[in-house]
A protein has these predicted regions:
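Membrane-proximal helix-loop-helix units in multi-pass membrane proteins
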Residues: 109-151
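Interfacial segments of alpha-helical transmembrane regions
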Residues: 19-26, 92-105, 154-165
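Internal transmembrane alpha-helix with an interfacial aromatic "cap," most often the third helix
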Residues: 71-98, 102, 143-153
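Interfacial helix-start motif at the membrane-water boundary
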Residues: 56-75
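Short, Lys/Arg-rich, polar N-terminal cytosolic tail immediately upstream
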Residues: 1-18
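Small-polar-interrupted transmembrane alpha-helices in polytopic inner-membrane proteins
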Residues: 99-115, 167-175
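Alpha-helical transmembrane segments of multi-pass membrane proteins
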Residues: 30-48
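Terminal transmembrane helical module of multi-pass membrane proteins
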Residues: 150-205
Length: 205
């Protein structure tokens, strides 16, 4: 009786762990991170969340604290990817699931890199490259997971949502880079910081 009951007891425990990883890493974690950089921007003298990038908070007063929070946030995103992989075993086929999860993990690792290598002049190139990798991998994850989910009738709405998120993210990324690039028509408005925050919330939603 005990041998027959053991396997059945392991799966619910594993599913519960996966749900906690998904909840903390993909639910609580994004909200906490948005609140953290919003509060950090409000309390820093002379900082404008409308004009300046979120990365600017990782340099200067309390910069190390914000960088630590950013790294923790990225690690929890990787934890979410693990939980997602476990929970989607009966929904996505192995190919779609592992390709999507791999992209989510790459996104998390890239954001760990942006937290360790800040926007300071000495490390800004690494920071910028890691940011691009994070954006591309997230858009890739949206696309792959969306294509996998639309193949399942019960999950088709979520798949469509994910594919729409890919297009919205691409549009926001293009507008944000346009806003931060000197000489463009949008540059004088100095709304790059605001657009980056819109992009951040959209990607975490």
């Amino acid at each position: 009786m005990q041998k027959n009951g053991a396997p059945g007891s392991v799966k619910p425990r594993g599913d519960q762990t996966a749900r906690w990883l998904a909840l903390i890493g993909g639910g609580i974690n994004p909200i906490a991170f948005v609140l953290a950089y919003t509060l950090a921007g409000l309390v820093r003298p002379g900082y404008s969340p409308i004009h300046q990038a979120i990365s600017d908070l990782g340099v200067g007063p309390n910069g190390s604290l914000m960088d630590t929070i950013a790294v923790l946030h990225a690690l929890l995103l990787i934890a979410f990817a693990v939980g997602f992989a476990l929970l989607m075993r009966g929904v996505l086929t192995a190919g779609w699931r592992w390709f999507g999860v791999a992209l989510l993990v790459v996104r998390g690792l890239a954001q760990v890199t942006t937290g360790l290598f800040t926007d300071a002049p000495a490390t800004v190139r690494i920071h910028s490259l890691a940011t691009i990798v994070a954006l591309l991998s997230m858009m890739g994850a949206f696309t792959v997971i969306g294509l996998g989910l639309v193949r399942t009738p019960q999950w088709r709405a979520w798949g469509t949502y994910s594919l729409v998120a890919t297009l919205v993210t691409l549009l926001l990324v293009a507008i944000e880079f346009w806003a931060f690039r000197p000489g463009t028509p949008l540059a004088p408005a100095r709304v790059g910081g605001l657009l980056e925050r819109v992009l951040s919330v959209e990607m975490l939603a």
